[in-house]
């Protein structure tokens, strides 16, 4: 099966024609069922609660304390490359991670403005810096829940997943060097991210770039 947030929308509904389904293998459905639509709504809600609502509450609670009790406060958020690059079989997960990324980067700009304001007993609040870590798949328990086809097995290259230790070391190096912003891992995915940004903003005469990105995504996720 697979975690609903890492399934195609129709897979969450239980009727993906390509055979990637949350609980069933119904490929012949021509319309959504009420149960399927309810599962989509519940999946979106759970994913947004975990990736957007939770971080927003934590940031709202901790930022005032960090601004007034630390001289060099910093926040590290573990996002995902799925929040930067659209991917088949990851629609809900990509959407919630993208929202999480924009939440963090927007709050970063807000903290930049707030750093100039006074605080009780202090001339000004400290500037809170942010590092957004956007790794590819990591070798942990979540990887085991990724989309699985009933006949072909996993839909992605799990053998290429990052080691937890590698992600931790890279993150600590950036924090120690006070290099904030976005850390994409592995590095070659930064190129894919840049190409995705160009794909969304550049009006080109042919569909060559879009076709290239689409082929790469379909090959990567085998969908």
What are these regions (language model features)?
Residues 59, 96:
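Active-site helix of classical SDR
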Residues 80:
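Residue(s) in the substrate-gating loop at a strand-loop-helix junction
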């Amino acid at each position: 099966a697979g975690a609903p947030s890492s399934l195609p929308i129709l897979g969450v509904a239980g009727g993906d024609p390509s055979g990637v389904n949350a609980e069933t293998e119904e490929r012949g459905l021509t319309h959504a069922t009420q149960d399927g639509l309810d599962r989509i709504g519940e999946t979106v809600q759970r994913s947004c609660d975990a990736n957007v609502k939770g971080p927003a509450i934590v940031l709202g609670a901790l930022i005032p304390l960090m601004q007034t009790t630390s001289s060099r406060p910093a926040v590290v958020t573990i996002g995902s490359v799925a929040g930067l690059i659209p991917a088949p079989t990851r629609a809900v997960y990509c959407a919630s991670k993208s929202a999480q990324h924009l939440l963090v980067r927007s709050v970063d700009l807000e903290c930049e403005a707030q750093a100039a304001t006074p605080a009780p007993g202090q001339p000004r609040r400290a500037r809170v810096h942010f590092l957004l870590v956007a790794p590819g798949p990591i070798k942990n328990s979540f990887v085991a829940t990724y989309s699985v086809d009933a006949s072909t097995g996993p839909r992605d290259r799990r053998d290429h997943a990052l080691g937890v230790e590698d992600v931790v070391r890279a993150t600590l190096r950036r924090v120690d060097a006070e290099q904030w912003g976005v850390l994409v891992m592995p590095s070659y995915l930064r190129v894919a991210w840049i190409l995705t940004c160009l794909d969304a903003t550049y009006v080109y005469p042919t569909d060559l770039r879009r076709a290239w990105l689409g082929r790469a995504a379909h090959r990567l996720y085998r969908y």
